UniProtKB/Swiss-Prot annotation:
The gene is rnlA. Its EC number is 3.1.-.-. It comes from Escherichia coli (strain K12). Composed of 3 domains, the NTD (N-terminal domain, residues 1-90), NRD (N-repeated domain, residues 91-197) and DBD (Dmd-binding domain, residues 198-357). The DBD is responsible for dimerization, growth inhibition upon overexpression and recognition of T4 antitoxin Dmd (via residues 327-357) and antitoxin RnlB and subcellular location. Forms homodimer in solution. Forms a complex with cognate antitoxin RnlB and with enterobacteria phage T4 antitoxin Dmd. InterPro entries: RnlA/LsoA-toxin_DBD (IPR043994), RnlA_toxin_N (IPR045837), RnlA_toxin_NRD (IPR031845). It is found in: Cytoplasm. It is an enzyme of class 3 (hydrolase). The keyword Amino-acid biosynthesis does not apply. GO terms for molecular function: protein homodimerization activity; RNA endonuclease activity. Keywords: Antiviral defense, Cytoplasm, Endonuclease, Hydrolase, Nuclease, Toxin-antitoxin system. Induction: Repressed by IscR. rnlA-rnlB forms an operon, the downstream rnlB also has its own promoter. This is mRNA endoribonuclease toxin LS. Disruption phenotype: Not essential, slightly smaller colonies on minimal agar plates at 30 degrees Celsius. Strongly reduces RNase LS activity, restores growth of an enterobacteria phage T4 dmd mutant. Altered mRNA half-life for some cellular transcripts, including an increased half-life for an internal fragment of 23S rRNA. Allele rnlA2 is due to a premature stop codon at residue 33. Sensitive to high concentrations of NaCl, sensitivity is eliminated in a crp or cyaA deletion mutant. Increased levels of Crp and thus increased levels of cAMP. Pfam families: RnlA-toxin_DBD, RnlA_toxin, RnlA_toxin_N.
Length: 357
């Protein structure tokens, strides 16, 4: 029997309280209290029970490197506390137990810097140059909210880009922005988080034919980069690899929606510029974003609808992926291929509509 270690886990901090409450509710247990850890150490304390037994106390410590340690031995009911500890442990994508250490080829500093700068547009992401010599430049990417970090090293003489760290928020943001620059081999690596891709990828022409069928009349209008991303993603998706988590296989669709939506809006007199981004143009009166009246006034109803629908889908799925929070109609994990393909199919429809509306 394998003995679990509850130290230095790659738990998604934004989900810990929600997961704890849902576990206790589903078990018909009772919450005594949930709140910040007493004392100076960052974390969460969960105290709960069920009728006829002592209180269980679970302390969840937020470590300085972005990892989390669970301590369930504090309270009077250790066995009950371990139930919650095990539940939180099992929310971790098995691929996230290990550190990422992968190498991508074909990079120069002028191609890496824009990706770092675009990643830093996320409110919780910062990057800095850590070291530089004649052979290597090293950058550190840090999440100020989640405390995880990623080390990105450019080996100048070989053109190799090395990515090292935990596959948490910094990894997701950086590789999302990097995706448009990657060839099929590189995209496969970052999507399935393995140095040597284990998916038997589908041939590009097969994936391209599939994409032509999906896009129909919109296919000839696809931007070169958009077609590259979607075909590369389909090479992996259509191989149906057996993975513990499929959320990153939605990268190509989200990148494409972002690019096509920016292009469409710019053509309609709504350029999307940083730092404001898309937010300048949309209101959110309920669960969906809609174009503000002053920008919608000159557009046809079908244009307003698809632009609003596209941004709502992009914002919801991207926010969940980057910030790892619980969002309506989205979750951190896409646990099966059917769910992934459902989201991808919806994305393809949005991309098609953006081109033909």
């Amino acid at each position: 029997m394998t003995i679990r270690s509850y130290k230095n886990l790659n738990l998604v901090r934004a989900n810990i309280e929600t997961e704890s409450r849902q576990f206790i509710e589903n078990k018909n247990y009772s919450i005594q209290s949930i709140g910040p850890m007493p004392g100076s150490r960052a974390g969460l304390r969960v105290v709960f029970t069920r009728p006829g037994v002592n209180l269980a106390t679970v302390d969840i410590f937020y470590n300085g490197d972005g990892s989390t340690t669970i301590q369930y031995l504090t309270g009077a009911n250790r066995s009950l506390g371990q139930e919650l500890a095990d539940h939180l442990f099992e929310t971790i994508n098995p691929a996230e137990f290990e550190q990422v250490n992968m190498v991508l080829q074909g990079f120069v500093e002028t191609s890496v810097l824009p990706v770092l700068e675009l990643s830093a547009d996320e409110s919780h992401i910062e990057f800095r140059e850590h070291s530089r010599n004649a052979h290597t430049v090293v950058w550190k990417i840090i999440s100020t909210s989640y405390q995880d970090e990623l080390t990105v090293s450019l080996h100048i003489t070989t053109g190799k880009l090395q990515i090292q760290g935990r596959p948490l928020s910094c990894y997701r943001v950086f590789t999302f922005n990097l995706a448009a620059l990657l060839d099929l081999q590189g995209l496969e690596k970052v999507l399935i988080r393995q140095e040597d891709g284990k998916a038997n990828i589908v041939q590009q022409e097969v994936a391209r034919t599939y994409l032509q069928t999906v896009m129909a009349d919109a296919y000839p209008h696809l931007h070169v980069t958009a077609e590259k991303l979607l075909v590369s993603g389909l090479c992996v998706k259509l191989a149906a690899p057996d993975l513990p988590d499929y959320c990153m296989l939605l990268y190509p669709e989200l990148r494409t929606i972002e690019g096509v939506l920016k292009s469409k809006m710019s053509g309609l007199g709504m350029p999307v510029q940083q730092p404001a981004g898309f937010g300048t143009y949309f209101d959110k009166p309920a669960a969906h974003y809609i174009l503000k009246p002053q920008f919608a006034a000159t557009l046809r109803p079908e244009q307003i609808n698809i632009i609003s629908t596209a941004y709502t889908f992009f914002n919801v799925e991207r926010h969940s992926l980057f910030h790892m929070e619980t969002v309506v109609d989205a979750s951190r994990m896409i646990s099966d291929m059917a769910r992934l393909m459902g989201k991808a199919t919806r994305a393809w429809g949005i991309i098609k509509d953006l081109y033909i509306v």
